[in-house]
Amino acid sequence: MNIFYFSECPITSAKAQPDKMLVKMPLETAQMLCTAHRIVGSEDYCNKHDLYKKAYWNHPCTVWARECSANYLWLYAHFLALGNEYKFRYGREHASITKLKMPLVRLPANIKLSYKRTPVAQAMPHEYKNDDPIKAYRDYCTH
């Protein structure tokens, strides 16, 4: 479970995903977005749209996703971009995109509204973390 944050732009960040990460990232991202709905959203909405069950709800990236609407919306845009990149590379739509792109477009009902994102979680060994999360993730993924 992680958000490989290679760029401030969710599209550029998705395009930078290595193949071995890209195959699993639409699912992991969907799990984080669904967990946001399960924790700060409506259980009725989750059940009506058959959202994934809560997963790794205390993971730093999953917590980050539900901290505020700006975080959630960035991650949702990244989710769509991951899906587009997956389709470009593999010629088919990822199952998580097919199932969840429409229900996840809606913000969780009780998420804190904000136009500004909080600092992205750096879920990696301490030696790679620094003030620049883009550099931290690039260093982490190349070592």
PLM regions: where:
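Aromatic-residue-lined binding/catalytic grooves and analogous aromatic/hydrophobic interfacial grooves
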Residues: R106-H143
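A glycine-rich phosphate-binding loop feature that marks nucleotide/adenosyl-phosphate handling sites
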Residues: T98-V105
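An N-terminal structural lobe/cap that precedes and organizes the functional/catalytic core
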Residues: M1-H94
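Intrinsic disorder and flexible coil segments
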Residues: N58, I97-T98, A123-P125
